[in-house]
Amino acid sequence: MSEDRLSRSGDGNKILYCSFCGKSQREVRKLIAGPSVFICDECVELCNDIIREELEEKSQSARSSLPKPKEILEVLDQYVIGQQRAKRTLAVAVYNHYKRIESRHKNDDIELAKSNILLVGPTGSGKTLLAETLARLLNVPFTIADATTLTEAGYVGEDVENIIQKLLQKCDYDVEKAQHGIVYIDEIDKISRKSENPSITRDVSGEGVQQALLKLIEGTVASVPPQGGRKHPQQEFLQVDTKNILFICGGAFAGLDKVIQQRCTEAGGIGFGVKVKSSESKRDVGKVLAGVEPEDLIKFGLIPEFVGRLPVVATLDELDESALVKILTEPKNAITKQFKKLFEMENVELEFRQDALSAVARKALKRKTGARGLRTIVELVLLDTMYELPSQEGISKVVVDESVIENKSEPYLIYQTMPAKVASGE
């Protein structure tokens, strides 16, 4: 114990002093002892004030940096083509969610409820991309979970708590950051229960998972092992509060449009002025989905309690040929721009003719994979060229047209010394 922090009074008793401000134990209310040091109650209060001020400054900085709904929509427009209705819904919901978090620091009688989001739309319509773009814009941790791999605790498969463990991994186990992150749960429609009536037998990958997710998405303190899973039961668990984590659930919900049609037919018509015919177009299906009600989701197989915890529902349209062509060329990280960049690294210009773009879009529509299939098609078409190109010299340009996409010819190679089109095999 340091001598300058101790002295003796006339009666022989030791007088203790605060190691920080130097006041004696007689000048303060409380002196707390540590290893070779002491701290008084006044210094503790001062430390608390300093920390509180820093937290308030951070909170004010976060408030000023939170983008407005219009700003969120502008960024989404740069990466996601179409889906204006869904993007506007998401922009408002995300803005309100983070405003709600800020309001919790204020002394207010009104507590704002949490609004998680459900995205309904066909495969490849942009559900995952929307969630990823939002997380990148807001600079918060983001993770994707597959609902089909989840099971109830005690069964083979992933616990729902593993979702939070993945989120922690994304931010190097910074609990505070994770508690303000975004979780996207994909294929949520695949955990619908098998019938509308409550199951008598155990449904560990359907209704059981929905029950397990209830508390997590509503807000609970989840105990998460740093190393994950059930394999290390003796580890010290991290406590993560999920009440401020934004959960976005997405699924294709194939057949949901028929459930909506049936409800509207029984009610004597369909809302939003949509008339459903047997020869209904894909665009009409999108309009039908836009009229989804909680009762439709319950009939589809989601339990009422789960639907109640996803109050914001955004529907996405199936992409047509025109939208797919735009996706190929317009976004900031468009597929054609990425491949052009790759070829540029070899000092070669890559050109996609308009008929080639339309052919790629038609192929993707036939495969029913939406925008997700576009990259695969372009990758296969250019594979041999990308294999040969680094070994060849004198090539200045590669041209792709409709015949190339339809596998009727190879990409056209234009040489610096030979301006005419020459097939790549020659």
From Swiss-Prot:
Keywords: ATP-binding, Chaperone, Metal-binding, Nucleotide-binding, Zinc
Gene Ontology MF annotations: ATP binding; ATP hydrolysis activity; ATP-dependent protein folding chaperone; protein dimerization activity; unfolded protein binding; zinc ion binding
Organism domain of life: Bacteria
Disulfide pairings: none
SMART domains linked to this entry: AAA (SM00382), ClpB_D2-small (SM01086), zf-C4_ClpX (SM00994)
Pfam families assigned to the protein according to its UniProt record, in alphabetical order: AAA_2, ClpB_D2-small, zf-C4_ClpX
Binding site for Zn(2+): 18, 21, 40, 43
Residue stretches making up the ClpX-type ZB domain: 6-59
Example GO biological process: cell division
Residues that bind ATP: 122-129
GO annotation, cellular component aspect: HslUV protease complex
Entries under PROSITE patterns matching the protein: CLPX_ZB
Quaternary structure (record): Component of the ClpX-ClpP complex. Forms a hexameric ring that, in the presence of ATP, binds to fourteen ClpP subunits assembled into a disk-like structure with a central cavity, resembling the structure of eukaryotic proteasomes.
Protein name: ATP-dependent Clp protease ATP-binding subunit ClpX
Species of origin: Xylella fastidiosa (strain M12)
